[in-house]
Amino acid sequence: MSKQLNPAVPDQPIVLGKMGSTYGIRGWLRVFSSTENAESIFDYQPWFIQQAGKWQHVELEDWKRHSQDLIIKVKGVDDRDAANLLTNCEIFVDSTQLPALEEDDYYWKDLMGCQVVTTTGYELGKIIDMMETGSNDVMVVKANLKDAFGMKERLVPFLHGQVIKKVDLTAQRVEVDWDPGF
């Protein structure tokens, strides 16, 4: 692991993945990618992690696909014990590296915290997570405390045009055509 002062800590950090369990005894780790194509995580460099509230630059020595997993070798991490210290560390990059999106496409990070409101004005709650289901993405919406339907959370498909009627990231608001009782 590099302890260099450069490269600079990201101004706009975003989580692109997470380091998983160790693999073998030579310091390799599984890595879980949040990018659409799992291997694309390696296109974004430099990587940073946070340990004990401090940013650390992580330099990759190597990576490879092993069965269904991606595994990485971090420079300076040469045994299982050292690799164990990195288990469950989130991998950050500067979000300015991410490509510009087409109209009606959004990064999940930008949707987090948005208020979800039906076309009739009923406030469903706030987006707390997003899930990929294969056919479409799904918003996990934490219901407001006094939800009239007694819901704690809702799963609302992110289908632009069908369910999603309007996204206003400036106002942190997503308008949906969705039955609040569902």
Curated annotation (Swiss-Prot):
Main localisation: cytoplasm
Compartment list: Cytoplasm
Keywords from the UniProt entry: Chaperone, Cytoplasm, Ribosome biogenesis, rRNA processing
Keyword rRNA processing belongs to the record: yes
GO MF terms held by the record: ribosome binding
One Gene Ontology term, aspect cellular component: cytoplasm
InterPro entries (UniProt xref): PRC_barrel-like_sf, PRC_RimM, RimM, RimM_N, RimM_N_sf, Transl_B-barrel_sf
A GO BP entry: rRNA processing
Function, as annotated: An accessory protein needed during the final step in the assembly of 30S ribosomal subunit, possibly for assembly of the head region. Essential for efficient processing of 16S rRNA. May be needed both before and after RbfA during the maturation of 16S rRNA. It has affinity for free ribosomal 30S subunits but not for 70S ribosomes.
Family to which this protein belongs: Belongs to the RimM family.
Subunit structure of this chain's protein: Binds ribosomal protein uS19.
Protein name per its UniProtKB record: Ribosome maturation factor RimM
